[in-house]
Amino acid sequence: MTYFMLFLGLCFVLGGLAVASNPSPYYGVVGLVLASVVGCGWLMSLGMSFVSLVLFMVYLGGMLVVFVYSVSLAADPFPEAWGDWRVVGYGVSFIVVLAAGAVVGGLVGCWDSGVITVDSVGMLSVRLDFSGVAMFYSCGVGMFLVAGWGLLLTLFVVLELVRGLSCGAIRAV
């Protein structure tokens, strides 16, 4: 199980690396899907199946729509691939930064904490991921409002960017 968790962590880092060093939006979608599937699988293997399912639906439902808009806006006739030297240089530099962060984190002593999986204190009648979702709705009302306004603003920005020269969704009244 330890090797499987390490493999999922490595795949998650590689998916994030693919999103960060994407040469064109076409390949960024592949990295995002890889990172979201592996991250949700990681959460599911830790015992948080509900949160994993919710995040999977949000990532694949919401973020892929954003990438569809960016692909339609940045349609290149000759997109750069991951094999180009510039993109390989980005990837190597990101890996060097991650390795340096791991070394510094190990020297400082940031790796002493463990992972709390399903139960926080022994056998409980409520799983940790369900109580966490309840805490989102009880204590996180302000953050939900800020996130909702941010998503509404993002929707209007995307609609303005996509409309081009024609009369789009937002018109002067």
UniProtKB/Swiss-Prot annotation:
InterPro entries: ComplexI_Subunit6, NADH_UbQ/plastoQ_OxRdtase_su6, Nuo/plastoQ_OxRdtase_6_NuoJ. GO terms for cellular component: mitochondrial membrane. The keyword Transmembrane applies. It is an enzyme of class 7 (translocase). The chain crosses the membrane at residues 1-21, 27-47, 48-68, 87-107, 139-159. It is a multi-pass membrane protein. Belongs to the complex I subunit 6 family. Core subunit of the mitochondrial membrane respiratory chain NADH dehydrogenase (Complex I) that is believed to belong to the minimal assembly required for catalysis. Complex I functions in the transfer of electrons from NADH to the respiratory chain. The immediate electron acceptor for the enzyme is believed to be ubiquinone. This is NADH-ubiquinone oxidoreductase chain 6. It comes from Synthliboramphus antiquus (Ancient murrelet).
